[in-house]
Regions:
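Short linker/helix segments within small regulatory modules
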Residues: 64, 193-206
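Short cysteine-rich clusters marking metal-coordination/redox-active sites
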Residues: 176-179, 209-212
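Short functional micro-motifs and their immediate structural scaffolds
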Residues: 181-185, 217
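Short, polar loop motifs at secondary-structure junctions
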Residues: 12-15, 93-97, 133-138
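Extended interfacial segments that mediate partner engagement and assembly in macromolecular machines
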Residues: 78, 82-105, 223-236
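BRCT (BRCA1 C-terminal) domain core and associated BRCT-interaction motifs
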Residues: 115-129, 138-139
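Flanking scaffold residues of small Cys/His-coordinated metal-binding clusters
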Residues: 170-174, 201-204
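Ubiquitin-like/PB1-type beta-grasp interaction modules and other compact soluble beta-rich domains
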Residues: 1-88
Length: 244
């Protein structure tokens, strides 16, 4: 092997971050002899929050480790379900549908469609929320408390990926999908003036957001939402069993 190269084996789960030409078992990466292993991994395209372990000759090392070119290096993906200090999240501006679905099942999700990258990182750090994004550059920003790349182009796939990765505690029908506030049961008489005539005639059970005042009921789309909740419960239950 050329002494100026490292032989790095990335776990297959991380190949999506690599250029297509580099998606194979052993990758030869030019090395200047001084950079940290974390820098080498990120330069190859893999954000460090997606890395579960770094192994050099079978031994775990930290991202600050400076490798010797003869050492075989293995980069492993985060193990699922990932254990995190907090099951609270903040989502970037492109994941609005995912935010609403997570709130539907009771996950604490901060989301605004007008925050720039600096504001997202500040909120993640201040509130100790896991930043969920599909912006790889954002995950490579220094000082980010904790982040994760969301896999999938469709909201269904993104939803499944987040639940599979974190297996957060679920509490369906307890959060406002619009603002993340908590819902509280409310008598029909208290909200009757806010309802359309058809809704007043057809439904009797309501809840209201304690933050924004939005009123909820199990309406025409209720069966579809029930399916989403049931699917989420199955995914989290399966992952919780895997963790024990």
């Amino acid at each position: 092997m050329d002494r100026r190269e490292l032989c790095v084996r990335f776990a297959a789960e991380l190949w999506l971050f690599l250029p297509p030409r580099d998606r194979h078992a052993d990758l030869r990466i030019p090395y200047d002899g001084t950079s940290s292993l974390g820098h080498v991994v990120e330069s190859a395209g893999v954000p460090l929050p997606e890395v579960g372990s770094l192994l050099v000759d079978g031994r775990p090392v930290t991202p600050s480790y400076r490798p010797v070119t003869a050492d075989p290096i293995h980069v492993l993906a985060v193990r699922r379900p990932q254990q995190v200090p907090s099951s609270r999240f903040v989502l970037d501006v492109h994941l609005g549908t995912l935010a609403r679905r997570l709130r539907l099942v009771g996950v604490d999700v901060a989301y605004r469609n007008d925050l720039d990258d600096d504001a997202l990182i500040a909120q993640a750090n201040t509130d100790e929320r896991v930043l969920l994004t599909q912006d790889r550059g954002l995950l490579r920003r220094r000082g980010l408390w904790l982040g994760a790349y969301v896999r999938g182009a469709r909201p269904d796939d993104q939803f499944r990926d987040v639940l599979d990765r974190f297996a957060p505690p679920l509490a369906p029908w307890t959060r406002c999908t619009a603002c993340n506030g908590m819902l509280s049961p409310v008598g029909k008489a208290e909200v009757e003036k806010l309802l359309l005539p058809g809704t007043r005639r057809s439904y009797d059970t309501f809840a209201r957001c304690l933050t924004c005042g939005r009123v909820y009921w199990h309406g025409a789309h209720g069966s579809h939402l029930d399916e989403i909740v049931d699917k989420a419960s199955r995914i989290v239950a399966a992952q919780s069993e895997n963790a024990t």
